[in-house]
């Protein structure tokens, strides 16, 4: 990607010219057609999932590297008796897995990788222990082992984004309390336009996080095709089929977008987010 930060900075400087229409500022349309990135919103929340399919962490700040957020999905449970192309134990096979919570203890408190996992019953077991593997093997019905992969274990892409407007709309359609945790994104955006499924319009373009010279960026590659995990209540693991049905019904089973990292940097809650259409890059 061509470094678009000069354009981003100009967009920020010119975003509020004298006499600018307030509706344009609110909608984010100011600057369209002016060959510059457009401010689309800000980072509302950041999430990291140290162990694939287990509970996530809500962060105020995170480092974005070539393989996603630092520490995201670097650990996963491998099913030892599986010879297929996808050997990982996920909440699709064991819904209760989302109620397991990775934790850090002692000197590892500042590390991106967990040292322990808290079970739904409150027991804390070392992340690479035989005790944890035996517990999860018993629950899933097949032996498992914890694996550490430096580049992460992703189903589709290393970074995922969804807007709060999309989460709220799906909750309304499914008659369920909106809960972003069902969608397991890395980045939750609060968009200026507050339009559900606005993310679809970003495919093929780029998102920039902040307006500094070291701003991080991702290329938006495709819409996020959803699976039954969105049906699981993050606290109880109880399913509600209406969530996935609603996404299938109104959006061809897609909600949110995937991306690939094109510029490393730091992400932070409250950070301004700019969209750069493909034609302008």
Residue positions per predicted region:
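N-terminal amphipathic/basic-hydrophobic helices that include classical n-h-c signal peptides
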Residues: 1-35
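Metal-cofactor-dependent catalytic cores
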Residues: 25-281
